[in-house]
Amino acid sequence: MSKDFVHLHLHTQFSLLDGAIKIDELVKKAKEYGYKAVGMSDHGNLFGSYKFYKALKAEGIKPIIGMEAYFTTGSRFDRKTKTSEDNITDKYNHHLILIAKDDKGLKNLMKLSTLAYKEGFYYKPRIDYELLEKYGEGLIALTACLKGVPTYYASINEVKKAEEWVKKFKDIFGDDLYLELQANNIPEQEVANRNLIEIAKKYDVKLIATQDAHYLNPEDRYAHTVLMALQMKKTIHELSSGNFKCSNEDLHFAPPEYMWKKFEGKFEGWEKALLNTLEVMEKTADSFEIFENSTYLLPKYDVPPDKTLEEYLRELAYKGLRQRIERGQAKDTKEYWERLEYELEVINKMGFAGYFLIVQDFINWAKKNDIPVGPGRGSAGGSLVAYAIGITDVDPIKHGFLFERFLNPERVSMPDIDVDFCQDNREKVIEYVRNKYGHDNVAQIITYNVMKAKQTLRDVARAMGLPYSTADKLAKLIPQGDVQGTWLSLEEMYKTPVEELLQKYGEHRTDIEDNVKKFRQICEESPEIKQLVETALKLEGLTRHTSLHAAGVVIAPKPLSELVPLYYDKEGEVATQYDMVQLEELGLLKMDFLGLKTLTELKLMKELIKERHGVDINFLELPLDDPKVYKLLQEGKTTGVFQLESRGMKELLKKLKPDSFDDIVAVLALYRPGPLKSGLVDTYIKRKHGKEPVEYPFPELEPVLKETYGVIVYQEQVMKMSQILSGFTPGEADTLRKAIGKKKADLMAQMKDKFIQGAVERGYPEEKIRKLWEDIEKFASYSFNKSHSVAYGYISYWTAYVKAHYPAEFFAVKLTTEKNDNKFLNLIKDAKLFGFEILPPDINKSDVGFTIEGENRIRFGLARIKGVGEETAKIIVEARKKYKQFKGLADFINKTKNRKINKKVVEALVKAGAFDFTKKKRKELLAKVANSEKALMATQNSLFGAPKEEVEELDPLKLEKEVLGFYISGHPLDNYEKLLKNRYTPIEDLEEWDKESEAVLTGVITELKVKKTKNGDYMAVFNLVDKTGLIECVVFPGVYEEAKELIEEDRVVVVKGFLDEDLETENVKFVVKEVFSPEEFAKEMRNTLYIFLKREQALNGVAEKLKGIIENNRTEDGYNLVLTVDLGDYFVDLALPQDMKLKADRKVVEEIEKLGVKVII
């Protein structure tokens, strides 16, 4: 007898926080075991079905597509706690495995999964019997594990109920119903098996044996238990002591012979139960039409009756280019017309005319409806056709863009055009698309959030019951990897040879070498930590949860539910269960509709400038050589300027001193981790300013590299170099670009040979070509997409232009739209530096947003007051327009009879100073709000609730901070600045501060929360606010116990600590190690000068130079010195000899700071 077997009950990584089987690893193991077919049955979804199908087919293994559905015995519409006929809580649901036999079955499976989310979601996506009756055709059913309905009743010896459900399921599935048996050594399962065998005989239903595989190898069992602990938010110790029956099960992906041995003699008919898995395999189709689709599924675009798609695109492109030429936005030359014709031929030949027509349609609709659209994004800027028909607004020929960077004729794949829209109106464009192509044909797109290295370490440590610090120490050693800012994986940190890592990320990455060695050393020194890392390694990369893609939209030619399974989130938004990559492979049109706030701001600025100055700015026609713009950039005054506002970017601008649009483009491409760390940026700056000669590898490359002073900055430069030197076709050049960018080793090896051979054949010396290839490998991976950089460079230039020429309008709009408190505070500070006075809110003068009064005053907007909001602010402004003005508080309340104007709103307005024009103190007005019930409550019943006791003395600054988010008439730190003498770091400077490096902060405690830990200790979390920003601070129990008397709401404190990144939320927090009153701190710091050295500075000669400065400026009555050295894991304070005192005047401090050393006096 054949001892074959097929797994039909198997959970991949898409059984979220339950299945620990990665599909790629499953395929390798299935091939190793000799499986002819493998089935999948993820819980309640089909997220992984297409990926599973393609991966198995690629290795010649038959994929069997199934789903372990959540099934309710009641109605899927029921939402009560207990809705089923039995006493099983529907919160946990029943299970039923459904397998697609054929195309009809797959469509029905997708339909059931879709409806489970759309109609049946209650804790889990559920289906019911009614849906099975309607969509059961083409499906095979297995009765599942102990949570299956018949299995559950069979396990508790309620045989009649089990029989009833077997009969009901048989009515739908007939011979395609199988009663599922498992050999998992659970007593209830053994009872269920015995009863199900008898029921099978009685009703002529077949039995089937399954493994219910949840992890790949037997040794993965512990990692799976950890995964379950994460799902249930418990530790593994809590699970083992609780009612967790699965902890002793064998749930690995076993080979056939293991399954035969496992079931041998367990029950009557065990051989047939195993062989029935082969029967199911034979019943299922070898392939599915939906998954094998080789055409592009584009929605139908209506063209004039006498035109084809291709003819109509050509007509629009020629017409559009002529209009661009007439407006001076393109040249009427042979180069333009030949490029247009070439692109049209490629587009039409590849079958993408419809794609271009669809995209230009909704973009031009947006423009006609006054919805701002970005000038371009990504590689689409390389297309002249896109420019001609209005998809982009950047001339690709003028800027040297390559069409093949966007659409490679040698590699047929759907074009990818992402579009930026005004943030406030993005949804209108999507709604236009829904109305044009059908609401059922348009959906958002799911994204799978996977377990990444750092967070996985912390998760696993928590599940293992290990201290947070154990995993945190390891997580902080994981460095950033490539130019996209991703982190090294655990596989790389723990297993990959260091030489390979340096080859991949660059020989200059000594931080990677040091951190990897330290990471491995820690693992070897502790068996517990080694187990932590090896467990995390198995879970890294699993899908943790899903969310909706921020911008992705898919548009189909027919209802999407006929093509893919759909998902509905908690808000009812519909999305595909497949992500963007899978949708593209299936031939569907997916687009990124991005909302860009800056486009909204530019629109508002333009309207305000026209209103106040009568100037109608056309941003596309602005001269790109405006002196005021470049002066602003060179001085680093770019707070609020698109893409140029970070502290690091400001410093780069000051060093680079841009004086042309090309410099702005280059800055956007260069300000990324790779170029900054590799030295490319320094080389660019030195060459620009003539401090280093501009060199080209070959004279022929000067036209390509001249704009960037011989430095490879753009991907397009790499492509052009390969064409000039090696004779690459445009398509081959793009393949090279992709190989370098994606670090594809196999493809890189092929392209290297082709590059060198081609250049040598064209007469270039092999040695020099090989050296150039090494440089390309080293630096080209840092290169950036020029078309994207240029498009965003325009937006940067436009915002800088408004700031330089119309600063009042710039700040009024930016302050209105900025929701981030830190950025808002920086804008306030910047506005003051530009000479503007920020006026407090006034109920008779403030608008909804910030407004300009006179030449240099900006009035606070009502909507920015916490507790008011935009909708209420609009109601107030409308009432004021009607009544002209409000005489006072009572008059305001009488004239704004609206339920939105409640006690909370009025109190917020008073606290913000909106009634200060009455000359009455805020304390008095607040008391009136609380106590003048008779006078104030006449307008509304119970408007203000019960009267309060007399209001205590109030601090106006505290009130302002509470409702405005910052202090407007002063600052609590004003009283301490002289005392502290700037011996602390401004919070805004932390943006560029090294994580884990110690800092001293001074500020006001706000939003204080004291929490009780699991151990019964207390800790604190609060925001610390200074004049430059705010940061969340965490005070752990030990520190809190020592400093709790100082930690009070609204108190000014000095804190020492370090920055720490919360990897789950990506928020940066400040971990407090010490807390002082300003007086205590000033006393401790008196006559002391602190110098902070990094480890590399201590080693590379800076220390010697520092010593020289100290020796030259010693004095008997100077400052004591404390030298702090950052050694990476910890800091060392070196108190220098008492007689070593320093004359600490400003010149000496500046001399020390020029060494790149931080000084605190």
Swiss-Prot record:
GO biological process: DNA replication
Enzyme class: transferase
Catalyses which reaction(s): DNA(n) + a 2'-deoxyribonucleoside 5'-triphosphate = DNA(n+1) + diphosphate
Subcellular compartments: Cytoplasm
EC number per UniProt: 2.7.7.7
InterPro entries, alphabetized: DNA_pol3_alpha_NTPase_dom, DNA_pol3_alpha_thumb_dom, DNA_pol3_finger, DnaE2/DnaE/PolC, DNAPol_HHH, NA-bd_OB-fold, NA-bd_OB_tRNA, PHP_dom
Keywords: Cytoplasm, DNA replication, DNA-directed DNA polymerase, Nucleotidyltransferase, Transferase
Coiled coil: none
A Pfam family this chain is assigned to: DNA_pol3_finger
Tree of life domain: Bacteria
GO molecular function term, any single one: nucleic acid binding
GO cellular component annotations of the record: cytoplasm
Known partners and oligomeric status: DNA polymerase III contains a core (composed of alpha, epsilon and theta chains) that associates with a tau subunit. This core dimerizes to form the PolIII' complex. PolIII' associates with the gamma complex (composed of gamma, delta, delta', psi and chi chains) and with the beta chain to form the complete DNA polymerase III complex.
Family assignment from sequence similarity: Belongs to the DNA polymerase type-C family. DnaE subfamily.
Function: DNA polymerase III is a complex, multichain enzyme responsible for most of the replicative synthesis in bacteria. This DNA polymerase also exhibits 3' to 5' exonuclease activity. The alpha chain is the DNA polymerase.
NCBIfam families per record: polc, PRK05673.1
Full protein name: DNA polymerase III subunit alpha
Gene of this entry: dnaE
